[in-house]
Amino acid sequence: MAATCCWGRSGLSSLTRALLEAEKRQCRALVRTGKKPQGIRYLSSCGILASRCPKLPRPASPAHIQGRTFLNLAAPLLGSKRIEYSESKVLGFSIEQMYDIVADVQNYKIFVPWCNRSKVLSCKKGVTRAELEVGFPPVVERYVSEISVIPLHQVRAVCCDGKLFNHLETVWRFSPGLSGRPDTCTLDFCVSFEFKSLLHSHLASVFFDEVVKQMVCAFEKQAGRIYGRQEVPLAAAAKLRAMR
């Protein structure tokens, strides 16, 4: 039994040496010819042949999906146009009374058409920043407006941050009303706006004309609720407007 085992070890050793010699001869031949066997790689660290491992495909990097809402997408493709509206009216309230109503941005949510929310954010160096929310189904948007004033003469509001408008500017001007009637004033209202998307423009065209046309009336009604209604002679008011 012992002799058999020794012969077995000797035979295995001889077989191993023969395989290694064959491998070396093959490698020397490959070096001379400059060819590489297909599907075979040489592991120099241990001197054995091994099948080439196929490269695993790299996992694809996560695709970056750019999210854009339909309204934002419509803007650069379709665009919109700037719209302007102005109105002048003689009112039965003094300059100071109407100025106080227009400058009271905090309470716009109470009486301004389609204004759902109004909140003053800051007031520095004569400039007030306010956040307004306007809603006309199905659109409800918030924007920040900067309001600057010339006391008893002008209130100017400009949209400075929002998704709804490319441009929104509102100007109110106050001047004397009927001659000899300090309890009257002339209110000039001007608004210009441009929506960021054509879709908003289409929605606005259905009703926004009525909104801006109701604006002066809304402020006049608010003044009536606070100060009491004051009538202005229509003929005198018409004559004053004609002179302007």
From Swiss-Prot:
Which purpose does this protein serve, as stated in its record?
Required for the function of coenzyme Q in the respiratory chain. May serve as a chaperone or may be involved in the transport of Q6 from its site of synthesis to the catalytic sites of the respiratory complexes.
Kindly give the InterPro entries that the UniProt entry links to this protein.
Answer: COQ10-like, COQ10_START, START-like_dom_sf
> Lineage, please?
Eukaryota, Metazoa, Chordata, Craniata, Vertebrata
Q: Where in the cell is it found?
A: Mitochondrion inner membrane
**What species does this protein belong to?**
Xenopus laevis
Its primary localisation, in coarse terms, equals mitochondrion
What interactions and quaternary structure are annotated?
Interacts with coenzyme Q.
Key words of the record: Membrane, Mitochondrion, Mitochondrion inner membrane, Transit peptide
Protein name as it appears in the record: Coenzyme Q-binding protein COQ10 homolog B, mitochondrial
Q: Per its UniProt record, what Pfam families does this chain match?
A: Polyketide_cyc
The way this protein sits in the membrane is described as: Peripheral membrane protein
Q: Drop me one GO molecular function for this one.
A: ubiquinone binding
From its record, what is one biological process in GO terms?
cellular respiration
Task: Identify the gene encoding this protein.
Answer: coq10b
Using the chain's own numbering, where are the disulfide bonds?
Answer: none
Identify the PANTHER family for this entry.
COENZYME Q-BINDING PROTEIN COQ10 HOMOLOG, MITOCHONDRIAL, SPERM PROTEIN HOMOLOG
Question: Its family?
Answer: Belongs to the COQ10 family.
Q: Name one GO cellular component term.
A: mitochondrial inner membrane
